[in-house]
Amino acid sequence: SRSRLSDSRGLESCGLENLDLKCETLERKQPKPTWRQRLVTFLIAVTLLLSALWLLLAIWYQYGVSSVLTWLATIAIVGILAALLSTRYWDTVTKILQSDSLSNKKSISKNTATKLLIGIYGTVWLVGLGWFFSIEPKQDREWMAEVDQRVSYERDANNPDLITLTNVRNFDWQTEEDATKHWDTRTIDLSKLSGVDVTNSYWMGPLIAHTLVSFRFEDDRPLAFSFEIRKEDGESFSALAGFFRRYELSLIAAEERDIIYTRSNARGEQVYLFPISNLQQHEVRSLFESYLTAADDLNAKPAWYNTLLSNCTNIIFYMARIVSGDRLPWDYRIWVSGWLPNYLYDVGMLDAAPEKNNQPWSMNTWYERTHI
């Protein structure tokens, strides 16, 4: 019996030594990930993190940070994502493995968990995506006074050049927030259109500006149009929130004494007015008609403001490009609204020599001369 016990211990010792040797051999044979594999892993991790961040921001801006639903969704999404990312560090081979079968079981367990977590996260994210795109803009919220009316119009049956606009804003501003409200009705004659001015109002540094378009008339005062967010009572603007269906889009028709004064005086913004050159009369009229069409569209069906795709500047560019027969080239400055005047200068929409002495103006001179 002593001999059998000795033999058994010898075999056990030999087995352990062989297992250790096998583990060491597997470790040595384990290939190191290539730079391509590392890059793919990195891109997958970044994609997961960005997709989760997008969904969380959408929930936060729709329901508010203090909402219980926001926090429950945050905990669930972060938990699933953390568990999914942690599977990368699951041990596939360890020195404490007792057999090859257990090693295979370990590997299968990791793969199963990874697939399960990917399925759960993908389902949650797709449900969130569907929820986000199902959010509809509304017309019947508690709006701030400056955007609570929608411009509409009627065309004279006998003279189609005569347009009667209803709800033209003509406020008397005392402070940035206080004003005496006036919503006027005004009739204009499209045959008397004489030109276009573009106003840039800088409120957040040199890169970001609010853009307005004013139409000049031969025998009447200008009329301005402005695409803006339709703020609710107590609401403030956030560029980041503008990506997440937080604000409806509003088109304001206003007198310049209202819509420019409130920015240059009441709010203390830096405002510049640029007269546009090289536009034919039919192009000016077509651009005005585009605003009327936009008013019809927004009255029929509200739309979302988007910081990148449908803001105060690029909507104007989309319309202007159509009426000019695609004469205006695409440019990154369409999305960097503070540099829009430089774009207009480069494409010849600002007169290079606006004075009678024909002395050319640089862009710096334009900024100096057009500051309000």
Label every model-predicted segment:
Residues 7, 18-20, 100, 104:
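Intrinsic-disorder-associated, low-complexity terminal segments enriched in Asp/Asn/His/Tyr and depleted
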Residues 110-135:
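Internal/C-terminal transmembrane anchor helices
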Residues 337-372:
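A cross-kingdom marker for long, charged
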Residues 254-335:
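Active-site nucleophile-His-acid catalytic modules used for acyl/amide transfer and hydrolysis
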Residues 163, 174-271:
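Glycine-rich catalytic cores of cysteine/serine-nucleophile enzymes that process amide/ester linkages
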Residues 136-152:
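Alpha-helical transmembrane signal-anchor/signal-peptide segments
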Residues 39-90:
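Membrane-embedded alpha-helical segments of integral membrane proteins
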